């Protein structure tokens, strides 16, 4: 399990996709790209999609993500993306109360249970106490990182 911390943008692409019956249908597809700015995100997703889509397409939306770290699976069967909210638990000795801080991650896995296992694997090296407070499958088809 590897992870990458960066500025991530969620993008939506719209284009005419050829269906099995030969008819073209307008579809929206969702992707995540690593970028420094909105312009950089648009350039990156346009570059990536131009090699997969023959014909015209448009970038419908670009949104900064709520997460800054993504856990990438090394298992080739993990083809889905899950958004997970973890709560880190700390103890405030002054007030003698438990404090929880929420952090959101994007996790690659094939199933919901697989996503939980991948989170546990990624968090195994940390000393922090945490709980998974929410996890849900996303519509993202892929994540594109900057090339070195």
Residue ranges and their predicted role:
Residues 8, 12-14, 23, 44, ...:
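A cross-family "folded-core" feature that marks the main globular domain of proteins
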Residues 96, 103-144:
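Mixed-charge, glycine-accented linear interaction segment located at domain edges/termini
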């Amino acid at each position: 399990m590897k992870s990458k911390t960066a500025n991530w943008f969620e993008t939506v692409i719209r284009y005419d996709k050829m269906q099995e019956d030969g008819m073209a249908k307008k579809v929206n597809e969702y992707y995540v790209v690593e970028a420094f700015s909105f312009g950089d995100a648009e350039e990156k997703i346009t570059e990536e999609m131009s090699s997969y889509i023959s014909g015209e397409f448009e970038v419908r939306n670009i949104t900064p993500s709520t997460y800054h770290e993504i856990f990438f699976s090394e298992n080739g069967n993990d083809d889905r993306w899950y958004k997970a909210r973890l709560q880190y638990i700390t103890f405030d000795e002054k007030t003698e109360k438990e404090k929880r801080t929420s952090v959101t991650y994007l996790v690659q896995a094939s199933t919901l249970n697989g996503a939980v296992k991948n989170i546990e694997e990624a968090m195994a090296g940390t000393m922090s106490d945490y709980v998974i407070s929410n996890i849900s499958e996303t519509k993202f088809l892929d994540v594109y990182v900057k090339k070195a």
